[in-house]
């Protein structure tokens, strides 16, 4: 049932892209597609590494990881100012 709903959503989205007069959505999708095609091996490798690294974490380890990510983001923002 979920697969049918996903397929329906994709088909509606494709129809909306086709009917878009401005074509900006089609251009954006094409740009994302080109980026993915060009870097798909790196994207897939990063996805596998991320799933492997995060998949073995307990909830506490994941919370600590997210705190470290947030802290690194804040430090990056402060260094830009």
Curated annotation (Swiss-Prot):
The modification 6'-bromotryptophan is found at residue 24. The modification Leucine amide is found at residue 54. Residues 1-22 form the signal peptide. Pfam families: Styelin. GO terms for biological process: defense response to bacterium. It is found in: Secreted. The modification 4,5-dihydroxylysine is found at residues 27, 30, 34, 38. The modification 3,4-dihydroxyarginine is found at residue 26. Residues 56-81 form a propeptide. The modification 3',4'-dihydroxyphenylalanine is found at residues 36-37, 41-42. GO terms for cellular component: extracellular region. The modification 5-hydroxylysine is found at residues 40, 44. This is Styelin-E.
């Amino acid at each position: 049932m979920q697969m049918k709903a996903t397929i329906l959503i994709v088909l509606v989205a494709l129809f909306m892209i086709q009917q878009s007069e401005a074509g900006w959505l089609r251009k954006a999708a094409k740009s994302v597609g080109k980026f993915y095609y060009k870097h798909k091996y790196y994207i897939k490798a990063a996805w596998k590494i991320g799933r492997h690294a995060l998949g073995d974490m307990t909830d506490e380890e994941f919370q600590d990881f997210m705190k470290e990510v947030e802290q690194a983001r804040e430090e990056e923002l402060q260094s830009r100012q």
